A protein has these predicted regions:
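C-terminal-of-GTPase-core extension/linker across diverse P-loop GTPases
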Residues: 1-7, 11, 15-28, 32, ...
């Protein structure tokens, strides 16, 4: 079997604000735990609204690109109140749109209901976050994305991507060598991120994209989508 190390985060009460120094340092400890974790299980009480403290913790998860599972606890009580999984999922998406890709588990911790599913989800996102993609495959996907929806001109200049490569895992980190990073609009980068999430085994984990200017002849040479098929990089 597999072993897991659980890092609890005592000292943070899910109130609308941090009431005192003890709770403040509890929040700091929780943020440090998020940085250490391979996977975060972010718990919400099905009987309460999402609090300011919840939002602060999720901000830390987003900032650190830590894989996470959103966990709605006390689900037995929610069922009794005729709450549905779809309604709670929509509530989470509306509140944390930046984590709309993260899986959601509905559990009752007191009885262990759906605990196995929660563990399986944690294992799944851990596996996804550790995947490595060959440079050839990555470049073919980016090339197709640029063909389908070219980045628009900005300041009368054409954004160009020369090649893409994955440089790290936990989180999956992809470097795009380009002419000028500032030419790529936020909306186009979101589009590319969506394509990568759809085409690669990173559907439920954060993907970190780094735009880097190519050193030297930044404005010269063919862009990725201008290369013929035979010139596509195939190495890992």
């Amino acid at each position: 079997g597999r072993s897991f190390v659980a890092i609890d985060t005592p000292g943070v009460r899910k109130r609308k604000s941090i009431a005192n120094d003890i709770e403040f340092y509890g929040l700091v400890r929780s943020r440090n735990s998020i940085r250490r974790a391979d996977v975060v299980m972010m718990f919400f009480d099905s009987q309460e609204t999402i609090s300011r403290v919840d939002k602060q913790l999720v901000e830390s998860i987003v900032e650190t690109h830590t894989p996470c599972v959103l966990v709605v606890n006390k689900w037995d009580l929610a069922i009794q109140a005729e709450m549905t999984m779809d309604r709670w999922s929509q509530y989470l998406i509306q509140t944390f749109g930046m984590l709309r890709f993260a899986p959601v588990a509905f559990v009752t911790a007191q009885t262990g209901r759906n605990s196995r599913k929660l563990i399986n989800l944690a294992q799944s996102v851990f596996k996804q976050a550790g995947e490595r993609i060959s440079t050839g495959r990555l470049n073919r996907i980016v090339r197709a994305a640029v063909f389908a929806n070219p980045p628009p001109f900005r300041k009368n200049r054409r954004p160009k991507i020369f090649y893409a490569t994955q440089v790290d895992v936990f989180p999956p980190t992809i470097v795009l060598k380009c002419n000028h990073p500032q030419l790529f609009s936020p909306s186009w980068k979101r589009y590319l991120l969506g394509v990568l999430r759809e085409e690669l085994p990173f559907r439920e984990v954060p993907i970190k994209i780094l735009m880097r200017a190519r050193q030297g002849d930044e404005e010269t040479g063919p862009a990725l989508h201008e290369l013929p098929d035979a010139d596509m990089v195939e190495s890992d």
